[in-house]
């Protein structure tokens, strides 16, 4: 443990970023691939096509709800463990890991029960009634995905805990193993077995079981913060502090769910008013297309969040040890890297939308599908650089213990701006208004985030910056 602590406090910041961020990026990218790979194979199955794509778009926010709870537990535990180790409080760190395990299992079982009981109402709430085919496919996909929620949540919650224990490589491998299995099984179940949406969902769940099993294996062999038998219970005071640190991750994800629900319903409502998309055979196109755009955005944000979240143990330890100069250096490099990622994503979205669309089976679709998809990529993602910097700011504030500031900024972006503009702008611009909602939200959020960035730099240049 001492060697690990010394490494976090003395090694070059750039090297630490590579060691911790790269595995985290890969883990999140691979985790994102579960749903993205499903959508790619679904779209390229001629008997599913855009109806299956639209159904996947309907169900996707519901998996994000599970992810939101899992990352609140996992990221909160990760930050708490890192700060505790920086202060030399190993016992507290171990108790928090035990609490995280219990919380993730209990919450996943409750969520699964709710999903199975209220499935039809939930699907309708997220825009699944756009037409009969989409609703039917969404029902089938959602049922099997719900059965895998406990495994998915446990694996996602334990991933950052494993990183905090000092083994980001195993965290990456556990996620990668499940995703690879999913990629192998998807074409077999969808194309060979002709299982359709059920096949895509079953492949996903089997991959999630593998990831969860590897997480259990690691928990039994943890290096630094292995909990004892008495630690596997809910320690009230620790849970409160841990969840406070993870609340930003939760709100960031759950508010995205609210935004997606608003967007899906606005696409359904204003698509029904459009000359083309009001026709039954084209009604699912806006939802299917925006779902594809969101998958590309998810890939980019997985890189951005992975880069920032991977640095949480480094930031937490150095803040706990009072080494603010190192934290400031890391923040500077992080913002620069995130801006570069955003710039690359912007070039792809603006310059090569047709090629991106082709990955999701556009060859089987009408020209209306392709034309709307090109417009969606170029409009919805035109402020990717600011979106990436904003995300980095949210997570960094969380890492240094400023949970309230991070939470408020995240809520303003996703709920006040994201949901607000998704509901407001279509009233004036129709379907195009849905596409305008994201860039407008990112510009206004950056205005606020810029002030917080300046304030954070000032505090890191002075003595007495606080943690927790």
What are these regions (language model features)?
Residues 24, 28, 40, 79, ...:
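Transmembrane alpha-helix boundary and packing residues in multipass membrane permease domains
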Residues 50-61, 138, 142, 201, ...:
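Small-residue hotspots at the loop-to-helix junctions and early N-terminal turns
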Residues 19-38, 144, 178, 207-211, ...:
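Transmembrane helical elements of multi-pass membrane transporters/channels
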Residues 53-113, 152-171, 287-347, 351-353, ...:
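Small-residue-rich hydrophobic transmembrane alpha-helices
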Residues 29, 33-54, 123-132, 188-194, ...:
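Helix-terminus/linker motif at the lipid-water interface of multi-pass membrane proteins
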Residues 1-21, 81-148, 192-247, 315-383, ...:
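Short alpha-helical transmembrane segments in multi-pass integral membrane proteins
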Residues 27, 145-163, 171-179, 200-213, ...:
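Short runs within selected transmembrane alpha-helices of multi-pass transporters and secretion channels
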Residues 14-33, 37, 62-69, 147, ...:
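Residue-level signal for short hydrophobic patches within transmembrane helices
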């Amino acid at each position: 443990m001492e060697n690990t602590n010394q490494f976090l406090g003395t090694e070059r910041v750039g090297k630490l970023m590579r060691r911790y961020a790269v595995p985290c990026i890969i883990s999140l990218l691979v985790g994102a691939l579960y749903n993205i790979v499903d959508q790619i194979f679904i779209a390229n199955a001629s008997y599913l096509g855009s109806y299956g794509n639209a159904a996947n778009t309907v169900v996707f926010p519901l998996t994000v709800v599970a992810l939101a709870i899992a990352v609140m537990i996992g990221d909160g535990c990760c930050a708490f463990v890192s700060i505790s180790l920086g202060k030399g409080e190993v016992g507290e760190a171990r108790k928090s890991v035990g609490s995280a395990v219990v919380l993730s299992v209990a919450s996943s079982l409750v969520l699964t029960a709710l999903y199975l009981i209220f499935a039809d109402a939930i699907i309708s709430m997220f825009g699944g009634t756009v037409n009969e085919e989409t609703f039917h496919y969404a029902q089938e996909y959602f049922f099997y995905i719900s059965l895998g929620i406990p495994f998915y949540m446990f694996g996602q919650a334990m991933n950052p805990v494993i990183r905090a224990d000092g083994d980001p490589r195993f965290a990456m491998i556990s996620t990668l193993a499940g995703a690879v299995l999913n990629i192998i099984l998807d074409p077999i179940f969808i194309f060979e077995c002709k299982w359709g949406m059920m096949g895509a969902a079953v492949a996903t769940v089997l991959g999630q079981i593998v990831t969860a099993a590897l997480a259990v294996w690691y928990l039994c062999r943890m290096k630094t913060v292995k909990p004892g038998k008495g630690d596997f219970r809910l320690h009230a005071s620790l849970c409160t502090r841990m969840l406070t640190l993870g609340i930003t991750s939760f709100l960031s994800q759950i508010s995205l769910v609210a935004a997606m629900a608003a967007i899906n319903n606005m696409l359904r409502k204003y698509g029904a008013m459009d000359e083309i998309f009001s026709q039954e055979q084209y009604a699912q196109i806006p939802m299917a297309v925006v779902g594809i755009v969101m998958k590309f955005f998810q890939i980019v944000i997985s890189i951005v969040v992975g880069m920032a979240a991977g640095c949480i143990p480094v930031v937490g330890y150095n803040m706990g040890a009072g080494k603010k100069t190192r934290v400031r250096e890391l923040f500077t490099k992080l913002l620069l890297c995130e801006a570069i990622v955003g710039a690359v994503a912007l070039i792809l979205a603006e310059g090569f939308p047709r090629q991106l669309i082709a990955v999701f089976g556009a060859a089987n679709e009408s020209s209306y599908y392709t034309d709307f998809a090109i417009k969606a990529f170029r409009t919805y993602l035109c402020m990717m650089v600011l979106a990436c910097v904003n995300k980095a700011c949210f997570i960094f504030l969380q890492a240094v213990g400023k949970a309230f500031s991070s939470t408020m900024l995240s809520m303003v972006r996703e709920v006040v701006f994201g949901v607000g503009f998704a509901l407001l702008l279509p009233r004036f611009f129709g379907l195009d208004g849905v596409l305008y909602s994201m860039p407008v939200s990112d510009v206004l959020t950056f205005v606020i985030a810029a002030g917080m960035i300046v304030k954070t730099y000032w505090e890191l240049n002075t003595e007495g910056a606080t943690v927790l």
